[in-house]
């Protein structure tokens, strides 16, 4: 009738089910329930964080926190990177294992903090750019969140794998690193 439409909204913990909406988008009615098992998962929250790189470039990233995040407890930190990811702030991801990259929902649901920094590249200096983005982001997080600094890890796949392979030659700050397909 031209007065109703379908809508899909999502967030880190909201599956994008179909909703019927009127022309004013008031009182949407959920008409699908495609992921009922999600009620059995501890859902993290996600925050957009901003900090400055060592080169004074304003950066953004995503910080995933466990559902029952407690500032009196110290958490292990996993850092995953591949170019730019902060646009995924409101994206839904199912908590499932991956063959190649860490799933931030799965890790945060198991009491890890997960950081996904954007990497801004200086032409001709990808390794230096990744180092500046990741290390300065880690410095920022250590001041703001309850992180166990002895239990921090890096993970990158493909281009991110190359950056991981280079990062481990530039610092011993991280307890573990996984470079996939560098």
Language model regions located:
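Serine-hydrolase catalytic core recognition
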Residues: 2-182
């Amino acid at each position: 009738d031209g007065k109703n439409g379908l809508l899909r909204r999502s967030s880190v913990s909201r599956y994008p089910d179909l909703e019927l909406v009127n022309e004013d988008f008031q009182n949407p009615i959920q008409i699908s329930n495609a992921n009922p098992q999600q009620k059995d998962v501890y859902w993290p929250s996600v925050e957009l964080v901003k900090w400055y790189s060592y080169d004074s470039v304003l950066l953004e990233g995503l910080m995933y926190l466990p559902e029952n995040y407690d500032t009196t407890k110290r958490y292990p930190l996993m850092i995953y990177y591949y170019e730019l990811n902060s646009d995924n702030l409101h994206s839904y991801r199912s908590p499932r294992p991956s063959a190649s990259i860490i799933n931030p929902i799965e890790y945060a649901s198991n009491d890890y903090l997960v950081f996904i920094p954007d990497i801004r590249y200086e032409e001709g200096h990808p390794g230096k750019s990744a180092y500046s983005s990741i290390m300065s982001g880690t410095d920022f997080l250590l001041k703001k969140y309850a992180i166990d600094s002895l239990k921090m890890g890096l993970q990158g796949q493909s281009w991110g794998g190359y950056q991981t392979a280079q990062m481990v030659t530039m610092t011993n700050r991280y307890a573990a690193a996984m470079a996939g397909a560098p």
